[in-house]
Amino acid sequence: MKRWLWALPLGVALSSCNKEAGEGGRAEIRGRLLEKQVFVSGQIAVGPYALLDEKVHIVYGDGADGAFSDDDVDSGPNGEFRFPWLRKGTYTIYAIGDSYTAPSGKVAVSVTVTTDDRKSVVDIGDLIIDKIP
């Protein structure tokens, strides 16, 4: 019996190491931010084209904390963005665009993705937001 007593604390320690989504892993989420300019009528004026220096946000996990942004990055010259060093888990990526119908005049365009293993690279493709000229 004494021989196996050391296994109890080890078992408790290992079972409590369930890491949640967030920084600290080797997974990555990447994509490209594009904008299209839209008239009041809903017709597209210009675009979509790459959007430079615009904030792209990430929410770690299921957003149970009210979906506040956990981190953000600025889009690069070709609209590209990336969130490196993530753990396995669920993430929501979003950017804020303009809207004629929302009372605030702004709307979030989002996509929810899952990194399936600790080294996965998830490309969400193009995230397209509207801008009012």
Walk through the language-model features, giving the residues of each.
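A short, amphipathic beta-strand motif
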Residues: 27-36, 42
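Structured interaction patches on ligand/partner-binding surfaces of diverse proteins
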Residues: 98-125
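C-terminal motif of bacterial Sec signal peptides marking the signal peptidase cleavage site
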Residues: 13-16
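Short, surface-exposed beta-strand/beta-hairpin micro-motifs centered on an aromatic residue
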Residues: 74-85
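A short tyrosine-centered beta-strand micro-motif
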Residues: 89-93
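Short amphipathic beta-strand segments in non-cytosolic proteins
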Residues: 47-72
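Sec-dependent signal peptide recognition
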Residues: 2-7
